[in-house]
């Protein structure tokens, strides 16, 4: 009979600390801003497309069909798919954040055009054309955050010795869900404040005439949403500093630590500079002493002196209990 282990009590404080840990990583924070802004914008556009087509362009036809959200979403997605190979090429040639932001001006332009276009003077054919232009920025904005994510985990591992992929991924998903919920909710709240009339008849074929204020609100929210959120994402992409060259060095230092390779003074200084630039200040409580493996994959014991010599400069000096007591 195996002895039962003591049941650990749930520590809410420790739980919060462990899941807040990724946000100590400067590169991860900027990545989250890029990700949430781009995807929240997508959520709001998806929600507004129906109102925009059904209410703002009510009664207008294109190719013999009533204007619907299909004329917005379909061209948007087609252009996004076309941009994927180009984004991939620019990612390898330039950087991932460059591939993310290269089409964002088109995204912003498209949103502004949707805000200013109205049936009284705009040919309906401009709707899919503008959506197509917007999609040139939409593709990179949707694709690159997922490719950038592992690099932020690498930055964290270089700085602390801990590769908390699950925690980083969980907080990324949580931020996405919260941002998406607030974005879609905001659409409903704003339209409600502006006097949008709901269809309570139960018959979707019945059209409810909206006030000019509500129609203007739909157009303005469409434009302001894209302009503001994508501008934030664009700014964050410039603040995100991990490029291909730095990433290669980050992975070199991670691999060197795992293999117990001695770094030269120049390499140690380079690693410290990367940690300061890409991660920020390292909390000693977050530091995990990595296992050193030999060529056969066996764990090699490392002395405290070796740990302090190799990792102290980047992690903050690793001290044992005796040295701490001496200070006190």
Give residue ranges: language-model regions.
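Membrane-embedded alpha-helical bundles of multi-pass transporters/translocases
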Residues: 1-284, 304, 312-316
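Short linear proline/tyrosine/threonine-rich motifs used for host-factor recruitment
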Residues: 253, 292, 299-302
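Long, low-complexity, intrinsically disordered segments
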Residues: 297-328
């Amino acid at each position: 009979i195996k002895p039962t282990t003591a049941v650990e009590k749930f520590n809410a404080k420790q739980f919060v600390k462990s899941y807040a840990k990724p946000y100590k990583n400067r590169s991860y924070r900027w990545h989250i801003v890029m990700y949430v802004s781009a995807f929240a914008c997508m959520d709001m556009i998806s929600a507004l497309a129906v109102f925009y087509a059904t209410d703002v362009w009510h009664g207008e036809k294109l190719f013999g069909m009533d204007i619907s959200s299909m004329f917005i979403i379909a061209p948007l997605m087609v252009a996004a798919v076309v941009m994927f190979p180009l984004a991939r090429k620019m990612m390898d040639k330039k950087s991932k954040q460059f591939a993310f932001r290269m089409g964002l001006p088109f995204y912003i332009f498209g949103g502004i055009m949707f805000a200013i276009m109205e049936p009284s003077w705009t040919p309906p054919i401009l709707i899919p054309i503008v959506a197509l232009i917007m999609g040139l920025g939409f593709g990179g904005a949707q694709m690159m955050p997922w490719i950038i994510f592992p690099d932020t985990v690498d930055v964290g591992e270089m700085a602390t010795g801990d590769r908390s992929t699950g925690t980083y991924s969980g907080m990324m998903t949580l931020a996405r869900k919260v941002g998406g919920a607030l974005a879609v909710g905001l659409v409903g709240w704003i339209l409600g404040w502006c006097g949008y009339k709901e269809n309570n008849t139960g018959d979707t074929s019945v059209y409810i005439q909206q006030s000019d204020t509500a129609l203007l609100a739909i157009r303005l929210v469409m434009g302001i949403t894209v302009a503001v959120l994508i501008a934030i994402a664009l700014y964050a992409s410039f603040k995100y500093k991990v490029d291909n060259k730095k990433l290669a060095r980050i992975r070199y230092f991670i691999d060197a630590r795992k293999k117990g390779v001695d770094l030269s003074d120049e390499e140690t200084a380079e690693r410290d500079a990367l940690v300061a630039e890409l991660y920020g200040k390292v909390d000693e409580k977050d530091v995990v002493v990595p296992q050193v493996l030999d060529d056969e994959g066996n764990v090699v014991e490392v002395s405290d002196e070796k740990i302090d010599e190799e990792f102290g400069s980047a992690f903050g000096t690793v001290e044992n209990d005796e040295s701490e007591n001496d200070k006190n």
